[in-house]
Amino acid sequence: MKKICLLGLCLLTLGSAAAQKSLVKEVERDLKSNPASYPDQMKKLAPAFTNAETATEAQTWYIAGKGAFDYYDQQSVFAQMGKDVKKNLLGMSMLEGYDYFSKALPLDSVTDNKGKVKTKYSKDIIKQIANHYNDFNNAALFLWEAQAYPEAVKAWELYTSLPSNPTFAKAIKAPADTLMAEIMYNMGIGNSLAQNNEAALKNFKDAIAHGYDKKNAFDYAIAAASQLNNLQEMADISEKAYEIYGKEDTRYIGYMVNNFIDKKEYAKADKLIDKYITEDPNNAQLYFVKGVLCDSEGKSEEAVANLKKAIELDDQNANALFQYGYKIYQKACEIDQNEGGDMSNADYAKFRAEKVDPLLKEAAGYLEKSLVIDETLSDSRQVLRSIYYNLNDEENLKRVENM
């Protein structure tokens, strides 16, 4: 009885394998006659991808890969003609085709009558991928239009990596660095949109290394590094950016100095900012950064002097106005705390009117101006609320609270 059961099981297995092989041939015929049926044919072919017999045969994956590329060829022509196509499926067919071909290559070995092992599909697979090399870029664009950003990035990854892949290197000529750099930049945008900041940072850095020196590349790289809380990367990228765009955007200096402050390497920070001030002595932002640095080092008087210099050079620098106003506010609070004790109410009122309130009002003026220039400075609003509360100025307190 056991022998009969085992025989039945063997016959069932063989029958299943034969059915899958027949299915593979059927799908091959259907794809040849109707490339547009590719999506449906892959659903039909799905069992062959997991069947122990057909899943280990190169033919199964080769047919799927060729079907994907033929579908792309047909549908991309339709797209050029202005016909309605599913851009997501169109772009994905290139990725799927490459994946299918990649599975076929290591399985492609045929033993001839003389016992020699040869390949049956590999030559055509390499040719197919090489001939469709530029289509990986086109596929990425189709996927981008369909807002399939991770998939678009994957297509661009193939476009940028295939020329250096030993399997395809002889058949594919790498594009110029300028095009490579632009595509790496686009990959960074795609990964940023997909919130993959680590990959985006690498993409932007690769683009810069390949000669993409537009300001956005540096700024987006810094933004990605910021999302990763990587101050060192922010500083390294800023150093390169400052060489090109430092005159128009001195925030780069701030990122470099912040990195030193975070590491408490104040001497290096001082040396860096002093060097740039020597080179550009009329740059208000440099004095602002110097002021913040001095404040971090506990050099309050130097901080105030540098912040004041920043405002004198640029009275529209909202951050400098805020920091300067805040330092005056701190001074008022310090005087009040250190000198305002052990007094009668009358003496304290006189003391406040002469020494504290004038400083609070002066600070308020700078803070108010900072908000006129940049209404997003929430810290300015917070300090102003405290000032007007201490001045018993209900009208201005209510106004600031309603901002």
Where do the model's predicted regions map?
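Conserved structural position within tetratricopeptide repeats
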Residues: 47-50, 106, 161, 206-209, ...
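Short coil turns that delineate tetratricopeptide repeat
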Residues: 53-55, 109, 164, 212, ...
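TPR alpha-solenoid repeat register
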Residues: 60, 168-172, 183, 216-218, ...
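Short coil/linker segments at helix-helix boundaries
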Residues: 67-150, 154, 158, 162-181, ...
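Residue at a conserved register position within TPR or TPR-like alpha-solenoid repeats
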Residues: 68, 143, 184, 191, ...
